[in-house]
A protein has these predicted regions:
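Short hydrophobic/aromatic beta-strand micro-patches
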Residues: 715-719
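Conserved "right-hand" nucleotidyltransferase catalytic core of DNA-directed polymerases
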Residues: 2-48, 56-61, 66-72, 77-179, ...
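Conserved beta-strand -> loop -> alpha-helix junction used to position metal-binding or nucleic-acid-contacting
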Residues: 223-240, 247, 507-511
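Conserved pre-motif C helix in the palm subdomain of viral-like polymerases
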Residues: 290-297, 665-688
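Polymerase palm active-site segment centered on the conserved acidic dipeptide of motif C
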Residues: 219, 342-373, 568-586, 721-772
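Short active-site loop/helix that positions an aromatic residue
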Residues: 151, 210-221, 234-238, 377-382, ...
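Nucleic-acid-processing active sites and adjacent nucleic-acid-binding tracks
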Residues: 166-204, 335
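Acidic beta-strand-to-loop metal/phosphate-binding motif
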Residues: 143, 201-209, 480
Length: 772
């Protein structure tokens, strides 16, 4: 009995001790620094608690945790009864951070109202509207912005803001808010601004004009705004490396130079997500007025910089600004999509994919083909196929295995078809507007070099099989007018290389000529189909993109050593072009930028300082080893092999040199590709001028429309009976876009269904039309 009592007593004692321990733990309240930063040890129990900052946190979570910690310390945020020993990462992120956001949002809105400038006006009465109209009448230029329900095509304007710089007054006109506050009717508000926006004598300044232009044009009252400039695009001309071109981001970064010293809060920071229609007008008008106020001020600051740089002024106001109306026309015209063909093709692809899935289940039993690990284990482990890519199952690795195993060949075809179906054939019809056309966008700010980029969808990536869903409207064809070997013509102009000049001027095969010079062989031995021509072509095009020996080797299926030899032969055999490439490197190292033929800059602002630092490291390495890092890198084909150099010094030299060499490789490409981008943009402007005149004397069903630009190709919607003289004029406009020592050439083809049954100019004009 005593034994049993002792056991019970021991059990009771243990429970008492546990209860006391829990009480001790509960009674200790760590400091905020311990909870967030250092972690803490309960002095009574010795138990270690990790800090919230020491946990695995994303960058976004780190910023939120830091904000909460600082707010708690400053008293901006309270714990609201939460004991510090109960503070967890979840509590901080899901409870305290939202509270902090709400507090700061309320403070920002209060500050916005309290500091609202006296020249910011809410226009919600007839007298206020009349005052605005009278003020605008005296202004040769105004800033304009719209506030909308969202950013899609179907979203609508809920109000617009106008800044009048001479009067120094700023207006917001609401008419579709849902907050129940006083507003004027939409027809009244839009009817007074329509003649102003459509007046070619009044300059309109906007930030991201394409968005606002579409909203005005497709509104119920259809306002076609003309004579405008875009401060977002001007900023791109001034600095193609900006992290963000959003107005508030630019104002926060540069505002101190044009009168805005405080941070400019974004819409989401002030009002959260959702459309502007839900924003209280009494607050929203201040935000909206500031938008156009900022836009005008930013524009004046940009003009000051552009006036000091005539070449960039030319890029901005002779190329980029005139291009915007052309791109808008292209966007509004769009592609005619054959919905019936798309649906039938989708069914056909689905049937093919289903059949392939049955085949693949036999070749890859019980394997999840979406699992790279399972696929690799089966191919290289079970089947023992050659493993030349460290277990990779990417496209390149599978291509090498296709001849070894039939299942891999089917798998490659399967992936190709599933991508075609899921990326293009299924989603493209869903993007069609109510007019039955697909309205893609051409982004003039989409690349660092100045080339145009296709978006929503990216027509440049659409494979030929998917392009067949684009069919020209009744009585029309698609004319593809493609600059032939544009990069090479530009490289010839930039360098003055006699080899390129002679080949292009005479019409000889440029790749055979380059091969002959590279290998010191008669041109007869370097014709089409020879390995010399293939290697020279790869090297010529590769040098324009800064290709490394590894890339060259991969493209022609040789070793890296042979790839290096191909490049060496090319550079040695073509010294003038090589000198131009090196000149670009020197310009980047010295001044931090290169220029296109038209004067567009591609900036590498950090490189000159890094080159100086690399030179210092070179001398440090030379003092220790007798050779510079550059010499070691060249001799050993990689400085990492130079064990005589201390690791830290070697590593620093390697990473710095890698960044510099990347900029060097990009520099010649920037001058060549950037010049090509400028030429394509000017060609679009000139073609649009020609078509605008041509269409004046033609019925609408015979009108010419530019519908897209894909790389160096302009795609034009033309009538089926297009005359040869119009074709020749289109060719002339493109080939003579800018004066070059060797006139460029174009390749033309005509399609009813894009990329299907292409016909030449001669066939078209003789009545041999392509089939749908």
């Amino acid at each position: 009995m005593n034994f049993i009592k002792e056991i019970k007593q021991d059990d009771t004692d243990a429970r008492v001790k546990a209860a006391k321990r829990k009480k001790a733990e509960a009674s200790y309240m760590p400091t905020l620094q311990e909870v967030f930063v250092t972690g803490w040890i309960n002095p009574k129990t010795g138990k270690k608690k990790n800090s919230i900052a020491s946990l695995k946190n994303s960058d976004a979570d780190k910023a939120k945790i830091k904000a909460v910690y600082e707010a708690l310390n400053s008293g901006e945020l309270g714990l609201e009864g939460i004991p510090t020993n109960k503070l967890t990462k979840t509590t901080v992120l899901s409870v305290l951070y939202p509270q902090l956001v709400a507090i700061r949002k309320e403070e920002m809105i209060h500050h916005l109202i309290e500091t609202a400038p006296k020249n910011y006006h809410l226009v919600n009465t007839e007298s206020a509207l009349n005052h605005m109209v009278t003020t605008i009448e005296k202004e040769p230029a105004i800033a304009v912005d719209t506030e909308t329900t969202g950013v899609t095509h179907d979203d609508v304007i809920v109000g617009y803001s106008i800044s009048c710089p001479i009067a120094n007054e700023h207006f917001y006109v609401p008419f579709r808010h849902t907050t129940g506050e006083q507003m004027l009717p939409a027809d009244v508000c839009l009817s007074v601004i329509k003649p102003v926006l459509e007046d070619p004598k009044v300059l309109k300044v906007l930030h991201n004009v394409k968005f606002d232009h579409e909203k005005f044009l497709f509104d119920k009252y259809s306002i076609n705004m003309v004579n405008f400039v875009d401060t977002m695009v001007l900023m791109y001309v001034l600095n193609e490396n900006e992290e963000s071109y959003a107005l508030k981001k630019l104002a926060t970064k540069y505002g101190k130079h044009f009168g805005f010293n405080e941070k400019s809060d974004t819409y989401e920071e002030l009002f959260g997500k959702g459309g502007f229609e839900n924003t209280p007008i009494k607050v929203g008008y201040i935000y909206a007025c500031k938008d156009t106020h900022l836009t005008w001020s930013l524009y004046q600051w940009q003009l000051g910089h552009l006036k000091k740089q005539p070449k960039l002024w030319h890029i901005a106001f002779d190329i980029e600004m005139p291009l915007i109306p052309v791109l808008l026309k292209m966007h509004y015209r769009g592609f005619n999509l054959d919905m019936e063909y798309a649906e039938n093709y989708k069914t056909e692809l689905q049937e093919q994919i289903t059949g392939m899935e049955q085949q693949l289940s036999e070749y890859f039993p019980n394997i999840n083909l979406n699992s790279n690990q399972q696929l690799a284990e089966y191919l290289y482990g079970t089947l023992k196929l050659p493993n030349n890519h460290d277990g990779s199952v990417d496209k390149d690795a599978l291509k090498e295995l296709a001849d070894e195993y039939e299942g891999v060949k089917i798998l490659l075809d399967y992936r190709k078809l599933t991508k075609l179906l899921s990326t293009y054939i299924e989603p493209l019809p869903q993007k069609v507007w109510s007019d039955g056309f697909l309205h893609g966008e051409i982004n003039q700010m989409g690349t660092k070099t100045g080339r145009l980029a296709s978006e929503n969808p990216n027509l440049q990536n659409i494979p030929p099989a998917a392009r067949k869903i684009f069919v020209a409207p009744e009585g029309k064809l698609y004319m593809s007018c493609d600059f032939s070997k544009m990069e090479i013509f530009i490289a010839c102009e930039l360098s003055g290389d006699p080899n390129l000049y002679d080949a292009l001027h005479s019409g000889a095969d440029v790749y055979s000529v380059i091969a002959s010079k590279s290998y010191g062989l008669p041109i007869e031995q370097c014709g089409d189909g020879t390995v010399y021509r293939k290697h020279a072509k790869t090297a010529l095009l590769g040098c324009m993109y800064g290709a490394l020996p590894f890339t060259i080797a991969k493209q022609v299926n040789v070793s890296v050593e042979e790839g290096k030899e191909i490049l060496d032969n090319f550079f040695n055999g073509n010294p003038v072009l090589t000198a131009q490439i090196h000149k670009c490197h020197e310009l980047v190292a010295k001044q931090g930028y290169v220029e296109t033929l038209q004067g567009r800059k591609r900036r590498f602002p950090e490189i000159p300082a890094k080159v100086k630092l690399l030179n210092k490291l070179d001398q440090m390495i030379k003092q220790k080893t007798g050779k510079t890092g550059t010499q070691w890198d060249k001799e050993l084909d990689g400085i990492y092999k130079a064990k005589k150099i201390p690791y830290d010094l070697r590593s620093k030299w390697y990473s710095l040199n890698k960044e510099i060499q990347r900029a060097y490789r990009q520099s010649f490409n920037a001058t060549d590709q950037g010049s090509g981008g400028d030429i394509c943009k000017i060609a679009l402007i000139n073609l649009d001028k020609y078509f605008s005149e041509l269409n004046k004397d033609l019925p609408p069903e015979k009108h010419y429309h530019i519908v897209s630009t894909i790389h160096d190709e302009q795609l034009i919607e033309v009538p089926e009976d297009i005359p040869m003289e119009v074709i020749k004029q289109i060719e002339y406009i493109m080939c003579h876009t800018i004066p070059l020592h060797v006139t460029m050439r174009t390749d033309n083809e005509f399609y009813k269904r894009y990329y299907h049954d292409g016909k030449s100019s001669e066939q078209i004009t003789s009545g041999d039309l392509p089939q749908a």
